[in-house]
Regions:
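Short, surface-exposed, charge-dense and proline/glycine-enriched linear segments
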Residues: 108-111, 125-148, 183-187, 250-267
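A cross-kingdom marker for long, charged
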Residues: 204-271
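Extended amphipathic alpha-helical interaction segments
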Residues: 129-226
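Solvent-exposed, flexible loop/coil residues
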Residues: 5, 78, 155
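Gram-negative bacterial Sec-dependent N-terminal signal peptides
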Residues: 1-24
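Short, flexible coil/linker elements and helix-boundary hinge sites characteristic
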Residues: 9, 18-19, 121-122, 193-194, ...
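N-terminal Sec/ER secretory leader and immediately downstream segment
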Residues: 23-135
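General N-terminal targeting signals
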Residues: 18, 22, 67, 77-79, ...
Length: 271
């Protein structure tokens, strides 16, 4: 691509990248440095029911404080019963919070992309941006969703990462490439309408305007990212408690020993 087109493309992507990197830096800090937690199985939370499954195959469920493993009810003593009840309550409380956090992160990403690219690509690109973000939301929906009072969280941590991965990056690249004509017209118009008499003065004015837009977007995203980070920190602490509780549960109930739900970076609970 010629130098001018490259510069234009970089200008467009940098605004969105700056915002998204601000989001990622905040939201990933605790996840990757302190709280790397993944799920080995799918989790479904319904009123008075917790189901742990693998691609639709139920491994165990806790229903009305009763434990069923592979469809068979397990007899529990009082100590085991207390652990099962506590574990069910903790998982049932945390899964909806994780899903809410994911949805807020997606909404924040959508806002960042729209704020960054619409001024450059023009209003005509708005529909394409909406379509791209709808595709992202659809991919997220397949691994983390709420339908009424039913909550579902997919098994692998990578599923959420994939939603923001290569396919999303490719869609954004295609959006920019397909809108280069409109983008150059918008940029040219904004450059020529800038303050100053000479071309250099207009370029300086345009550069300052772009910097101002970028800083404004980054500020908006950073404020939202701070909130998500704070919520993530609280969830992290609760997940640490859940890891210990689940290990106790699996130690006390042999039927659950081979179904570790939680996996951490430092300790893999699969045996």
């Amino acid at each position: 691509m010629k130098k001018l087109l490259t510069s234009v493309g970089i200008s467009a992507v940098l605004l969105s990248a700056t915002s998204l990197q601000t989001v990622a830096a905040h939201s990933d800090h605790d996840v990757h440095n302190e709280c790397e937690v993944a799920l080995n199985y799918d989790v479904t939370v319904e009123p008075k029911k917790l189901i742990v499954s693998e691609v639709g195959d139920e491994k165990y469920r806790i229903e009305m404080d009763k434990l069923f493993v592979n469809g068979k009810q397990i007899s529990l003593n009082s100590e085991q019963q207390a652990l099962v009840s506590q574990y069910s309550q903790e998982v049932s409380a945390q899964v909806p919070e994780v899903i809410a956090l994911v949805n807020d992160a997606v909404e924040m990403a959508s806002t960042a992309v729209s704020l960054a690219l619409t001024p450059l690509l023009g209003d005509s690109a708005g529909a394409k941006i909406d379509e791209m973000m709808a595709g992202l939301e659809e991919r997220i929906e397949s691994v983390a969703y709420q339908h009424g009072d039913k909550f579902y969280l997919g098994s692998t941590e990578s599923s959420l990462e994939d939603a923001f991965g290569e396919e999303f990056e490719q869609e954004m690249e295609e959006l920019v490439q397909n809108s280069l004509g409109s983008m150059m017209m918008n940029l040219g118009a904004q450059m020529m309408s800038g303050d100053g008499d000479s071309f250099e003065q207009k370029m300086d004015s345009f550069s300052q305007k772009m910097d101002s837009i970028g800083e404004e977007i980054e500020l908006q995203m950073e404020q939202q990212a701070d909130d998500i980070e704070a919520r993530g920190e609280k969830l992290c602490e609760r997940f640490k408690t859940l890891v210990v509780l689940e290990q106790q549960l699996r130690d006390e109930i042999p039927e659950l020993a081979k179904y570790p739900l939680v996996e951490t970076a430092n300790t893999t609970l699969l045996e």
